[in-house]
Design a protein with these regions (language model features):
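N-terminal leader/targeting and assembly helices and adjacent pre-domain segments
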Residues: 1-132, 233-242
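Acidic, glycine-rich two-metal-ion catalytic cores of nucleic acid-processing enzymes
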Residues: 137-242
Length: 242
């Protein structure tokens, strides 16, 4: 938990700083052109990619080294492969998704501002204070990305630990913020290579089965990943929990 908190705190500060800078650039762009061409998003995407890539490397390395030390094995070379794979598979898509969300929210803010008869400076201010750049957004990103990267590292390095019959167990936070369907998953065990089957609520009622390799697995969708605090435990069927 301490490792998770320290790592997410570091990313939180960096993302908040980037969002403040990006908000100012977006405001200035609209003031300059009386329109929005989203030039600011190019700088944002490049900076965000660098921040996330560096963070993923730090998270996965720290998590993997801790697990390797606990098992008294030497798999340092594997860590570099795990890091490179995660950065390649996740970072670009994550940056693109958040950039597109930002574009859509600003476009909506401009549309509403024009409909309300606001002046260019007033709309520019609305852009700067748009929820895309809100501090809570940085906190959500920091928590979610740190959590997913840590769980990914645990999942990947668990295959290198020489376990005879590797088991994984879903471990939930179990407090008043825990999703009810994650509370139900608490203590669920499956073989490492199998998928957790998470019955996830859908709009309009009912549930859909989401298959996840580990807690925080992006395949579970936003409802299972954003701000999730569950962790996966890995151990041999005849071993103590690690």
């Amino acid at each position: 938990l301490k490792l998770y908190l320290n790592l997410s705190k570091s990313l939180n500060a960096k993302v908040k700083k980037l969002l403040r800078k990006t908000a100012r650039k977006a405001e200035q762009e609209y003031l300059k052109y009386n329109d929005m061409y989203y030039f600011f998003l190019e700088d944002f995407s490049n900076d965000f990619y660098k921040i996330l890539s560096s963070h993923y490397r730090s998270v996965i390395t720290a998590t993997s080294e801790r697990l390797i030390k606990q098992r008294e094995t030497k798999q340092e070379d594997e860590i570099d492969i795990i890091v490179a794979t995660y950065i390649a598979d996740v970072t670009a898509n994550k940056v693109a998704d958040i950039s597109q969300t930002t574009r859509n929210q600003i476009k909506q803010a401009i549309k509403i501002g024009i409909a309300d008869g606001l002046s260019i400076p007033e709309i520019s201010k609305k852009i700067r204070t748009n929820r895309s750049f809100a501090p809570y957004g940085a906190t959500m990103i920091a928590r979610t990305e740190t959590h997913s990267a840590m769980n990914y590292a645990n999942y990947e390095i668990s295959s290198q630990l020489g376990l005879n019959r590797p088991i994984k167990e879903w471990n939930s936070a179990l407090d008043d913020r825990t999703r009810e369907w994650h509370r139900t998953m608490n203590g669920t065990t499956v073989a490492r290579e199998e998928m957790f089957k998470v019955m996830t609520p859908i709009a309009g009622g009912g549930f859909i089965e989401r298959r996840m390799s580990y807690t925080g697995d992006m395949n579970g969708g936003a409802l299972n990943v954003i701000n999730c605090r569950c962790f996966t435990l890995y151990y041999d069927s005849e071993d103590e929990i690690i």
